[in-house]
Amino acid sequence: MPTIKLVKYLTVTAAVLTLATAPTPVAAAPEPVASEAPLQATPPAAGTWQPPLSTRGRYIVDAQGHRFRLKSANWDGAQGSWTGNGSTADPANHHAGQNSYGIPLGLDRASLPELLADFHELGINSIRLPFSNEMIHTAAPVPDAAVAANPQLSGKTPLQIYDAVVAALTHDGFAVVLNNHTRTSRWCCGIDGNERWNSGQSTPQWADDWVFMARRYAADPRVVGADLYNEVRRDVLDDPNWGLGDGHDWYAAARLAADRILTEANPDLLIVVEGINWTGLPVDGLPHGRPTLTPVRTLSHTLVNAHKLVYSAHFYGYTGPRHSGATGVGETHDPRYQDLTRDQLYQVLADQAFFVTTEGQHYTAPVWVSEFGSGAGETGTAARTWFGNITDCFADHDADFAYWPLVGWEGHDDWALLRYDTAGRRYGILGQGDWRGPAWNHLMTSATRTGYIPPVPVWRMLNTGHGDEVRSLRVRAGGDWDPGAYKAACPDGLRLTGLSHTGGRGLCTDTAAGDLRAAGNAQTVVTDERYVPAGGDWAGGYTKLQCPAGQFLIGYSRRGDRVATALCAPARTSLGLTGRTVWFDRSDNRPTDGAGGDFASGHYKGQCAADEYAAGIAFTTRLGAAAGPAALLCGPLPGLTAE
């Protein structure tokens, strides 16, 4: 993670970005190592939160609906420490001179019980636990010296040691978020062959490893999340993107992995999607920057479970909104975060990340700042001021966070909250004289919302720009209702309430009625006007796809720009037969409160009111007119209690 060594690395790589060739892929990794299954955790009686975790608006909650604020730290090492130069056997070629041997740091210096006791003393409740894909497939055991303080781990592979660490953490009451940090076991994050999830491997291979890991810990309910990939960024030649539908589309890849994890491995996991960390060339006058979560404003994820999405972002003082963190050659004249005033920093964090926590939007989700940090040896006024300002911002925003890093070696990595010497003596932020202590203590003890979080209306977008967006598992169980068409269906529990005239977007919600659908998987595919009652022409001159009486819209399909079908489901209660026509082929026609947000930026949109359901779609195929949705039939919801 970002430190002075990384800055030097970025400086060198930035200078050769336009000249270097693409990195050579490494050989394919072997199949996952057959090893003993991880221990199933038995939470201690003192545990006060009940897994699994889910989301309600901007908050993460436990199984009882109580707030669970991620007060986390990153226990790194299993993602690799080698810097990419020289022999891996030489400690000097590892970050800060610390050879992690592909396992969490500190196991050579302190026993697991001692480490966990120190973690508790910090006040954290959760651990982001990085790993590399290489770690999963490494068959060789680590040297005994790497686990000298934990001889029970002698002879084990990195994955088996990762198992033991997960089991120890969860048994002690910590929540664990698995983090796929890198592909190879190499220190992150520069031009290092680990820039994207599919650098040196295919997207299906990456997703396969995620299914493997999620299944591996599925029996441990305190393994609560899957953080899909770390700091997606430009490689030598190409940028990642958010929604272009190509092989560099991080938005689509994250959706694919989330789908597979939730449907094939563990439906209880939170899915953590980090924004894009860097695009462009860090050269004055050329496009470059740190998009972070800004693309989410116009294109957000909709998972098969509408209550499992968490977005994340990383912030370090020496990087910036358009500054890579490099020094010297390759450095631009853009401000670093630590160059910003307090007010400017607060605004930038809002613009880049915390806007996602705004309630009532299609993108509303918790935001976890899953990396930030600074060194105990930092003497710069700007860097120290930044650390105080950003921790104040987290406190003021009641944000979820994870410090980087948690554990290091004394005399090596002074960024670590806890450092241990070869005799196991502890140093760091819990001792006297660490300038970071007051800011850390303020963050850990500041006022925070606790207790029961009431359910809030959910809004989620549908996007058929590059293919199907069938988010309902009940609909999937019924098979392909319109082969060859692009299809979309709301997640189970939500109904369709809005459509765009062009672009294939939709908006789903549960507002006012909760889950409106009746039990079972019955659904109706509407392809013509057979369900339009006599005398009920609500869109004269237009083709109308109307649900049967007692049913409501949950999905749609299109062929090119033309509406193909409407997908309807029976309601759990009787629905009225009256309705109104909402036209949107010439302008937006949405409720004045803007609920759900702009789910189809740049396109005309129509949307039923919060106390209505959508019962039909009208469109035209006349020459010169767009054949997309032109009107919705919106009917009044009966007096329902949200479920």
Where on the chain are the PLM-derived regions?
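An active-site-proximal structural segment forming one wall of the substrate-binding cleft
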Residues: 99-127, 135-137, 143-225, 250-260
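Secretory targeting and sorting signals
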Residues: 1-32
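Extracellular glycoside hydrolase catalytic/binding regions
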Residues: 52, 95-104, 108, 198-200, ...
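Active-site-proximal beta-strand/loop segments in catalytic clefts of secreted hydrolases
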Residues: 63, 73-78, 130-134, 179-183, ...
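Surface-exposed, active-site-proximal loop segments in enzymatic domains
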Residues: 85-91, 95-100, 133-158, 186-201, ...
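Lectin-type carbohydrate-recognition ectodomains
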Residues: 459-643
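N-terminal carbohydrate-binding accessory modules
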Residues: 29, 36-126
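Aromatic-rich peripheral "rim/lid" segments of glycoside hydrolase catalytic domains that contact
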Residues: 379-459
